[in-house]
UniProtKB/Swiss-Prot annotation:
Belongs to the ABC transporter superfamily. Ribose importer (TC 3.A.1.2.1) family. Its EC number is 7.5.2.7. GO terms for cellular component: plasma membrane. Keywords: ATP-binding, Cell membrane, Membrane, Nucleotide-binding, Repeat, Sugar transport, Translocase, Transport. It is found in: Cell membrane. The keyword Translocase applies. Residues 5-240, 250-492 form the ABC transporter domain. It comes from Rubrobacter xylanophilus (strain DSM 9941 / JCM 11954 / NBRC 16129 / PRD-1). The gene is rbsA3. Its main location: membrane. This is Ribose import ATP-binding protein RbsA 3. Gene3D superfamilies: P-loop containing nucleotide triphosphate hydrolases (3.40.50.300). It is a peripheral membrane protein.
Length: 495
């Protein structure tokens, strides 16, 4: 079978860095070809070379047997290569139909035929399983719906290759399965899907072949049936990794945090739960179910209408995050770059930021550096200096800086909101080992995740949310993906 895309000896160099190093790759019509590897392996740069966002330093790229010269992303789209980015390239204040045909509007003589545009848009949306009005503004759509619009854009240009960069990063399990159905439909019509992912289980669910990159090079391309999880991880990181989800043998003690009847408008409705010392409590649910909203409400980041919070039997009055921090509650936000870190500050300053009130707002530079060095060693934060700005760190190391900050506050209860999102498999293993160690120390942990294997493997109990309410709490012996999804979607009644 003739490859729809062929790369031969493709390299990309930036000042001081070889991001892609002599890559050979064939992509076949009708296949899902996963590109896997740790952060910094070269996956995203390779996708940018294919979609002509970046110009290769050397090497040759062929599409349908024709050698391609670099002329930019518009040229790549005309050749039938479409890219669906993690951060969608949609105009939020235009309608769905306008986004689908932006720059290619149907009509004559400078006049747009809106009726034809809407009719064609409906057909494209049906093909990706999206039942929305083409006149709706993109800004009113959910993340999952916007992603479908991006895929419909690829169909609108009759793309032969659709590149998807971490497409499930912000999707719940039900939405992931719906996306996979769309992908299977694309490949059944002869289109190739080039798919970047960190998530091991979904690689085995969706891939036909897997190319593994490490340090800018291709280390293997194999049919998925020739791989298992251990072999794939070994190829990705170049070493053995133990259990990715090391369930801690922690002694579960008395109730640390008790929340009763927490409500906030339509977002949270009479939510109650408990977290015990040494326990990892999971929060599961679809996107928008209220998991993050509940954590933010307990932390004082969002106001509540009613409810009670107790820590170690003491009633708390939490009106702002500072109240929660002083009481001993920490929250590691899912948006570490937007809310969790001061990117322009050094690692040392970020680590001591939340604990300054306990030090009356003052800390000497020597003491600050000493604290940061201790946490760097404890958490294996990879950096030549704690004075470096946080923005230059990898996602996994940035996440460790956030953890170090909360350890410095001596928090008794820690909320981890999507702690593994956007970090590679090696960093994930370290992150979950750390969460387990914190539980063994007797802290109460709340783990919020859209990725059910994380919750099922790490948690002692799982609280499932639906439409702002607690739909049920499952004990460990009751865990199953089907049971969690049933509660989250309302197929199963509240328990």
């Amino acid at each position: 079978m003739e490859p729809v895309v062929r790369l031969r000896g493709v390299s990309k160099e930036f000042p001081g860095v070889v991001a892609v190093d002599g890559v050979d790759l064939d992509i076949l019509p009708g296949e899902v070809h996963v590109v896997a590897g740790e952060n910094g392996a070269g996956k995203s740069t390779l996708m940018k070379l294919l979609s002509q966002v970046e110009r290769p330093t050397s090497g040759e790229i062929y599409i349908s047997g024709e050698r391609v010269e670099f002329h930019g992303p518009g040229h790549a789209r005309r050749l039938g290569v479409a890219m669906v980015y993690q951060e969608f390239a949609l105009a939020p204040h235009l309608s769905v139909a306008e986004n689908l045909f932006l720059g290619r509007e149907p009509g004559r003589g400078g006049f747009v035929n809106r009726r034809a545009e809407k009719e064609e848009a409906r057909g494209l949306l049906r093909r990706v399983g999206l039942e929305v009005d083409p006149d709706r503004l993109v800004s009113s759509l959910t993340v999952a719906e916007q992603q479908r619009v991006e895929i419909a854009k690829a169909l609108a240009i009759d793309a032969r290759v659709v590149i998807m960069d971490e497409p499930t990063a912000t999707l719940a399990e039900k939405e992931i399965e719906e996306l996979f159905e769309v992908i299977r439909d694309l490949t059944s019509h002869g289109r190739a899907v080039l798919y970047i992912s960190h998530r091991l289980d979904e690689i085995f669910r969706i891939a036909d072949r897997v190319t593994v990159m490490r340090d800018g090079k291709v280390v293997a391309t194999l049919p998925v049936e020739e791989l298992d999880e251990a072999k794939l991880v070994r190829l990705m990181v170049g070493r053995e990794i133990g259990n990715l989800y090391p369930k801690p043998e922690a002694e579960i003690g008395e109730v640390l945090l008790r929340v009763r009847g927490l409500s906030r408008g339509e977002r949270l409705k009479d939510c109650s739960f408990e977290v015990r010392a040494g326990e990892i409590l999971g929060f599961a649910g679809l996107v928008g179910a209220g998991r993050t909203e509940l954590a933010r409400a307990v932390f004082g980041a969002d106001p509540v209408d009613s409810g009670e919070i107790e820590l170690e039997g003491r009633p708390l009055r939490i009106r702002k995050p500072q109240d929660a921090i002083e009481a001993g509650i920490g929250y590691l936000t899912e948006d570490r770059k937007g809310e969790g870190l001061a990117l322009q500050l050094g690692i040392d300053q970020n680590i001591t930021l939340a604990s300054l009130p306990a030090r009356l707002g003052f800390i000497g530079l020597g003491r600050e550096r000493s604290i940061a060095e201790r946490r760097r060693e404890q958490l294996n934060i990879r950096t030549p200096s704690v004075r470096r700005k946080v923005q230059v760190l990898s996602g996994g190391n940035q996440q460790k800086v956030v953890v170090a900050r909360w350890l410095e506050t001596r928090a008794r209860v820690l909320f981890f909101d999507e702690p593994a999102r956007g970090i590679d498999v090696g960093a994930k293993a370290e992150m979950f080992a750390l969460i387990g160690e914190l539980a063994r120390e007797g802290r109460g942990i709340v783990l919020i995740s859209s990725y059910l294997p994380e919750l099922i493997n790490m948690c002692d109990r799982i609280l499932v949310m639906r439409d702002g309410r607690v739909a049920g709490v499952l004990e460990r012996e009751e865990f199953s993906e089907e049971g969690i999804i049933a509660l989250a979607t309302g197929v199963k009644e509240t328990v």
